[in-house]
Amino acid sequence: MTARHYTAALFLAALSAFLLSCSPEACFEETNAYLKATFYSNDTKEKKTPDSLSVKGIGIAEKIYDRKEGVQPGLFPLDASGVTCSFEIKINDVTDTVSFHYTSYPHLISKECGYTFYHRLDTFFCKNESFYIYVSSDNITTANEENIRIFY
C-alpha cells in the first residue's frame, strides 16, 4: 500500500467516524412531568369522566382546559422554578381553587431527550373543599401513572 492510498484510507475512515458520531438521535420519550389527576364520582366512588372540565392556572392567561369534554386523566403542568402551583378547576358546574405544594428535582431521561424536572407532591389545599382529593402517588414523573384522584 502506497503512502497515497494509506492517506486516502485514513482520511475516509476518519470522515466516516466523524459523520457517524455526529448523527443526532431522535427523542421519542415523554419529556414533560405532569401532575395526573383521575376523576371519580363522589357518590359511587367509581371512575367518572366529567361532562365539562375547565382548568386555569392562577397567574397564567391561557386556559389548560376550556369546557373540554371527555378528559380522563387531567394533566396539570407544574412550574419547576417554583414550589407552589394553583389552579382554578371547574368540573361541570362546580368551581374550586386547588393549590399544590411540591419540590422539583432534575432527572436525566436519556442522552437523546436530555433532562426534565420531576416533582414530589408535598401537600395540597382545596380552597372551598368542593372536591375531595386523594393522593395515590406523590412522585410526579413522565410515567403514565395517576398521582391524584379528584372526587366530584
Where do the protein language model's features map onto the residues?
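Bacterial N-terminal signal peptides that target proteins for export
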Residues: 1-9
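Short acidic/polar inter-strand loop motif in beta-rich domains
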Residues: 91-109, 117
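Bacterial signal peptide processing site
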Residues: 23-26
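Tryptophan-paired
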Residues: 49-94
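Glycine-rich, aromatic-bearing surface loops/beta-hairpins
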Residues: 106-152
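C-terminal motif of bacterial Sec signal peptides marking the signal peptidase cleavage site
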Residues: 18-21
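Structural motif
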Residues: 38-47
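Short coil/turn motif common to extracellular beta-sandwich-like domains
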Residues: 29-36
